[in-house]
Amino acid sequence: MTHRASYLALVLVAACQPPPVDYTGVFDGSAGRWVDLTHSFSESTIYWPTDTTGFELHELAFGPTEGGWFYASYAFASPEHGGTHLDAPVHFAEGQLTNEQIPLSGLMGPAAVVDVSGRATPDYLVTVEDLTTWEAEHGQLPNGGILLIRTGWAERWGDRTAYLGTDLTGPRAVPELHFPGIGADAADWLVTNRDLVAVGIDTPSIDYGQSADFRAHVILYAENISGFENV
């Protein structure tokens, strides 16, 4: 039997205006709809190649007990950087927010989806022009909002080699990674000119696979902008 669990759901509020003070409509469904942007966790979940243990789910109990009632219980374990997950800013910025310190206002709000899938190559870097072109059509990225980058890489999910760019594991895999990410210039522009609480991308990292300095991580997380990966 394949057991699956989803750990994260993101809410897209289709608007480019500041988030409402009252989120009641989001939760009762009157202000929009819930969209699950996560990949399920299972034995086939794709992890960062140096996280080699993968997802583990162990059955502790399943069946009738001596007391006469049915009882099911499981234990799970997982490295941090696999499947759809949140990078807290402290991941690349010492002294910045840890997961439990991120307020709810840093995890929800109006979302903008910038689609670069039509031009994204395995080493594509999202540019300032990608962002300003989107704004020219849709308006300014929302204050207190979440920027989601669609590269089309989510369609490769399930094929580890196609998704990561290599079938290698461990440290030797890292130089062989190929997937799109956010360019350093675009990250700089965002922290200088816009007021986001989070970014997200449908690849294994907000930096592109060939990055050796993880500048998008460093720049954004230093400003307490969290990152969703493998969306």
Residues covered by each model-derived region:
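Generic alpha-helical structural signal
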Residues: L10-V11, D195
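C-terminal motif of bacterial Sec signal peptides marking the signal peptidase cleavage site
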Residues: V13-A15
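Active-/binding-site microenvironments in catalytic and ligand-binding cores
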Residues: Q17-V231
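Sec-dependent signal peptide recognition
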Residues: T2-L10
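Intrinsically disordered, low-complexity sequence elements enriched in Ser/Thr/Gly/Pro
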Residues: M1-T2, L148
